[in-house]
């Protein structure tokens, strides 16, 4: 979330919101947040998490991006947690709605990483890539090992 450099006045989108963890975190900081999610089960989890954390400034927009984003207020900051292979269309819509929007895309696949950088640069943004790695400890006999988990890439974009 730090990568988005959000301010209290910002309107935020969380596209491909999943369970809404990013949306809730943004909402708890006082931002107006629109969680966009297409899967019914995930939408139900977002509703439950919104109630659990009293994040009433979190609005759920059920549907597929980018179409589901058309009627939302123009964003200042956008987190893309899932794109359904429509990243170019989603990012193009974001920039059309607000050419100064700050964007962060999460990726676990190298193809998504490459596409995010290409799309952001093609839209006149500077792309910055951060890799996040986590290792979990495991005891094997008298040894303690750290087993690496799959890395996550965060691609942030700011207008040049």
Region annotations inferred by a language model:
Residues 91-148:
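C-terminal substrate-binding/active-site "lid" region of AdoMet-derived donor-dependent transferases
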Residues 9-18:
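Conserved class I S-adenosyl-L-methionine
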Residues 1-8:
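Conserved alpha-helix/loop element of class I SAM-dependent methyltransferases that forms part
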Residues 36-77:
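S-adenosyl-L-methionine
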Residues 28-33, 97-99:
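Conserved S-adenosyl-L-methionine
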Residues 37-42, 82-83, 108:
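Short beta->alpha hinge that forms the Motif I/post-I loop of the SAM-binding pocket
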Residues 19-31:
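Conserved SAM-binding loop of SAM-dependent methyltransferases across substrates and taxa
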Residues 142-160:
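Core SAM-dependent methyltransferase catalytic element
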């Amino acid at each position: 979330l730090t990568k988005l450099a959000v301010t209290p006045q910002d309107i935020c989108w969380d596209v491909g919101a999943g369970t809404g963890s990013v949306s809730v975190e943004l909402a708890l900081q006082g931002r107006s947040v629109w969680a966009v999610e297409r899967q019914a089960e995930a939408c139900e989890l977002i509703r439950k998490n919104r109630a659990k954390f009293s994040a009433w400034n979190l609005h759920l927009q059920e549907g597929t991006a980018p179409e589901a984003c058309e009627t939302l207020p123009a964003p200042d900051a956008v987190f893309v947690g899932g794109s359904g292979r429509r990243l170019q269309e989603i990012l193009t819509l974001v920039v059309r709605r607000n050419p100064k929007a700050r964007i962060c895309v999460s990726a676990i696949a190298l193809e998504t990483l490459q596409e995010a950088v290409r799309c952001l640069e093609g839209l006149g943004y500077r792309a910055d890539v951060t890799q996040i790695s986590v290792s979990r400890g495991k005891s094997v006999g008298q040894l303690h090992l750290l087993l690496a988990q799959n890395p996550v890439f965060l691609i942030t974009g700011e207008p040049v």
